[in-house]
Swiss-Prot record:
GO terms for biological process: defense response; defense response to bacterium; defense response to Gram-negative bacterium; killing of cells of another organism; sorocarp development; sporulation resulting in formation of a cellular spore; superoxide anion generation. One of its GO terms (cellular component) is NADPH oxidase complex. The gene is noxA. Its cofactor is FAD. It comes from Dictyostelium discoideum. This is Superoxide-generating NADPH oxidase heavy chain subunit A. The lineage of its organism: Eukaryota, Amoebozoa, Evosea, Eumycetozoa, Dictyostelia. FAD binds at residues 283-289. Residues 1-19, 84-97, 171-184, 228-517 are cytoplasmic. It is found in: Membrane. Pfam families: FAD_binding_8 (PF08022), Ferric_reduct (PF01794), NAD_binding_6 (PF08030). Its EC number is 1.-.-.-.
Length: 517
């Protein structure tokens, strides 16, 4: 078997290095915690009582402590946004925070299962041990109970079963097919983690093996979480004015807002709340305005329950174009909108590269709107100076031709002001055209494309990523290219695969980044 060369390792490291290190450290930490505890109890008097059952139960309990201490960290969005601005951003994959949060949750799930199964076995063995043997081996007085009483009549027993019920509620509501249509239910059940942590604190109060220590593991992360919530609460109290709501084709609402002291970077996102719809329901949306503009905007795709209600609230007459202006309060007197943020995202990293590939699928184009606007303003302010990015390849994939109208004005301006040809636009239409539209395209002779209104012609069908990446790999040999994507998972897999493949097989290094919030 051939070992990989130094160059192959370096190329693998481009997209996998920091993730691999984090997973290795996390795995080693879990193994060390389990093995240390297992060996400790193997050499303790308790092993004489119930054997390997106590070793396995306590090892799983140690995994629970470690992972419960970690699970809040990936959702501390303000902390992660701050850390993005430090040297740690070069080593820690902050964009994978939700993936890591889910990984920790699964480890907690399996550790809980192992802990419960081991103790069910231990309960069976406890009944065969007399109080005298407890006294002789462990030096304590302990009653002889039936397995049922151990499981349900002791503090550790009944709290453990309630913890399992809470976990079932939290885990099932987090399944995507349930979370998306019933987000508020997910929000409330996920906050049962407070009950979960509280029960685990008291779970070990009557332990005969060691003093309870769960609280020592979680007090730090819980303190950070409280600070996080206080920051978000204070920010959400700031007055937000809806200065304009505009209805675009293909069920997209553009909301432009003004609020106090809201500084952000291109590519970041915010959380939006409409108290009239749901007091505690916050949804993430990419910021589509640029920092140079005197408002903050989001483009919202009307696809779910909450966005549907927002559409009805802002556009009761089902009109197109501008439907609301300068609104502070909803008809019920509550604030029309509340903002929390901004928060860091993958697209923030775009200015680290001199050559970038931006891929937006449908409404996934939103983070790149902010970036392209920012570049436009920078070019206008610093004409003929060194640009922020040497070359931008912008791929916009839409199923519906009307979707191109969302940012047609911006794209048109960029095409006209395309200094040094820094921007290449590649619009793709994947949906079918009507017979009339086909005739217009075939026989039209306008200077602008009849589908998009851009000067760049529309391509039909899906992009051929292998050909595209092969071309870029030749064009940017020995260079680093940032690849940024926002859109569906299936397309993300294709782009990630292409980025990894052409990084390994050519001299170009494609750094893949995906929006994930």
């Amino acid at each position: 078997m051939r070992l990989p060369t130094k160059e192959e390792i370096q190329r693998y490291w481009v997209n996998e290095g920091n993730k691999l290190i984090l997973v290795i450290l996390y795995t080693l930490g879990n193994i060390a915690a389990f093995v240390y505890t297992f060996v400790h109890y193997y050499n303790s008097p308790a092993f004489e009582v119930v054997g390997y059952g106590v070793c396995f139960a306590r090892g799983c309990a140690q995994l629970l402590k470690l992972n419960c201490a970690l699970i809040l960290v990936p959702v501390l969005r303000n902390l992660l946004s701050f850390l993005r601005g430090t040297f740690l951003n070069n080593y820690v994959p902050f964009d994978k925070n939700i993936v890591f949060h889910k990984l920790i949750a699964w480890v907690i799930c399996f550790a809980t299962f192992g802990h419960v199964m081991a103790h069910f076995n231990n309960f069976r063995l406890y009944q065969d041990i007399t109080p005298q043997e407890y006294k002789r081996i462990l030096g304590i007085d302990y009653p002889n109970l039936t397995p049922i009483k151990y499981a349900f009549a002791t503090l550790a027993g009944w709290t453990g079963h309630v913890v399992c019920i809470v976990m079932v509620l939290m885990y099932t509501s987090a399944v995507e097919s349930i979370r998306r249509p019933m987000f508020e239910g997910f929000w409330y059940t996920h906050h049962l983690f407070v009950v979960f942590f509280g029960l685990l604190v008291v779970h070990g109060l009557h332990s005969i093996l060691e003093p309870t220590s769960f609280w020592k593991w979680v007090i730090g992360p819980c303190a950070l979480y409280i600070v996080e919530r206080l920051i978000r609460l204070l920010r959400s109290k700031k007055t937000t004015m809806l200065i304009q709501a505009r209805i675009h084709p293909s069920r997209v609402i553009e909301v432009r807002m003004k609020t106090e002291r809201f500084k952000y970077k291109p590519g970041q996102y915010l959380f939006l709340n409409c108290p009239t719809i749901a007091q505690n329901e916050w949804h993430p949306f990419t910021i589509t305005s640029a920092p140079e503009e005197d408002f903050v905007s989001c483009h919202i795709n009307v696809v779910g329950n909450w966005t549907g209600k927002l559409s009805t609230l802002l556009n009761p007459d089902k009109k197109m174009g501008i439907v609301q202006e300068n609104v502070l309060k909803s008809p019920d007197g509550k604030p029309i909108l509340r903002i929390d943020g901004p928060f860091g995202a993958a697209s923030e990293e775009v200015f680290k590269y001199k050559q970038v590939i931006l891929v937006g699928a449908g409404i996934g184009v939103t983070p790149f709107a902010s970036i392209l606007k920012h570049i436009k303003y920078q070019m206008a302010r610093t004409y003929n100076t060194t640009p922020l990015i040497d070359k931008v390849h912008f791929y916009w994939i839409c199923r519906d031709r009307n979707s191109f109208e969302w940012f047609s004005g911006l794209i048109g301006e960029l095409e006209m002001e395309n200094h040094n040809n820094f921007l290449e636009i590649h619009p793709y239409l994947t949906g079918a055209l009507s017979a009339q539209e086909i005739r217009d395209v075939m026989y039209g002779d306008e200077e602008k494309d009849l589908i998009t209104g851009f000067t760049t012609p529309t391509q039909f069908g899906r992009p051929k990523w292998d050909e595209i990446f092969a071309d870029h790999a030749l064009r940017y040999a020995e260079k680093d290219v940032g690849v940024f994507f926002c859109g569906p998972k299936l397309l993300s897999k294709s782009l990630y695969k292409a980025s990894t493949h052409y990084t390994k097989t050519t001299t170009c290094r494609f750094h893949y980044n995906k929006e994930n919030f």
